[in-house]
Swiss-Prot record:
Function description: Single strand-specific metallo-endoribonuclease involved in late-stage 70S ribosome quality control and in maturation of the 3' terminus of the 16S rRNA.
HAMAP family, per the entry: Endoribonucl_YbeY (MF_00009)
InterPro entries linked to this entry: MetalPrtase_cat_dom_sf_prd, YbeY, YbeY_CS
Cofactor: Zn(2+)
GO molecular function, a single term: zinc ion binding
A cellular component term, taken from the record's GO annotations: cytoplasm
Gene label: ybeY
Protein name: Endoribonuclease YbeY
Keyword Metal-binding set for record: yes
Note on cofactor: Binds 1 zinc ion.
Subcellular location: Cytoplasm
Enzyme nomenclature, EC number: 3.1.-.-
Entries under NCBIfam families matching the protein: rRNA maturation RNase YbeY
Enzyme class: hydrolase
Length: 179
């Protein structure tokens, strides 16, 4: 049985957020302050982990269903910083909205009780631009980008339209579970 109870799951979140006071006039939506709080993100990721663990029909690595202690990193950074990471690790020029660096593999997890999933980097500037473009709140856009990065940490890829559609639909499902 792949179902687990929320109280059994633990998450160690390493959260870092740069000083974005220069954007304070653009960050006035309801709930925007939450995106800068570690406890908020910890609750979000725990919710998503528990949502995943309560279902058996997701294409995820087996270790996700066998472990109960996870950790991951989330950093909210600038366009300049994410462009540097994008160039160094993805060999792409310019900023992007979200980057994920999973550090797990099935083979290395057999005897581990605690699983380090990896790191997610989100550009606040790109999130702001996209929130205007898609007419979302910055809160919604940050949740969207975090869910996308999180699924990459769990091994999801979108190398074709079908995989991308499945991933985006699953992101929506996870986000709705937060309401």
């Amino acid at each position: 049985m792949k179902e687990k109870i929320i109280s059994e799951i633990s998450l160690d979140l390493v959260f870092q957020c740069n000083d974005f006071s220069q954007f304070s006039n653009k960050l006035k939506d309801t709930n925007t302050h939450l995106i800068f709080e570690s406890i908020f993100w910890e609750k979000v990721f725990l919710s998503w982990i528990n949502t995943i663990l309560k279902k058996e029909d997701y294409e995820l690595p087996n270790y996700i269903f066998e472990k109960k202690s996870f950790s991951l990193g989330l950093q909210i950074i600038s366009n300049q910083e994410i462009a540097s990471l994008n160039k160094k690790w993805m060999q792409k020029n310019g900023p992007t909205d979200v980057l994920s660096f999973p550090i797990i593999s099935d083979e290395s997890l057999n005897n581990l009780d605690h699983i380090e999933l990896g790191d997610i980097f989100i550009s606040l500037e790109m999130a702001l631009e996209q929130s205007y473009e898609y007419k979302n709140s910055i809160y919604r856009e940050m949740i969207w980008l975090a869910s996308h990065g999180f699924l990459h940490l769990l091994g999801w890829e979108h190398n074709n339209e079908h995989d991308l559609e499945n991933m985006l639909n699953f992101q929506e499902y996870l986000i709705k579970k937060l309401d």
